[in-house]
């Protein structure tokens, strides 16, 4: 049961990023303009989409889970600080703390790692 819940949790925490990447692809130029409005160069969008697809898939599959989790935790914190700093707007406050909460979840995953249903757990290391 623990393995199933761990796997479901990895899907849940990753799904937001997969959906976000999908939306960025559908509205590429609009997202690029929006990012540039916050001082983020538009050329970063391609790398952002790549990260929002690859790293969540790594987490779901349990491959390099700790590293992917640390990167997404840092990404979530950076996103909160850059894009959700208008604390006069209730929606922006919620979005800020959503990203901070996601970072906390990713750090928890980085500390504890995935359970048995993960590629990382299937690896066999040989000490020489």
List the model feature ranges, each with a label.
Residues 1-26, 33, 42-50, 54, ...:
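Extended, low-polarity transmembrane helix blocks
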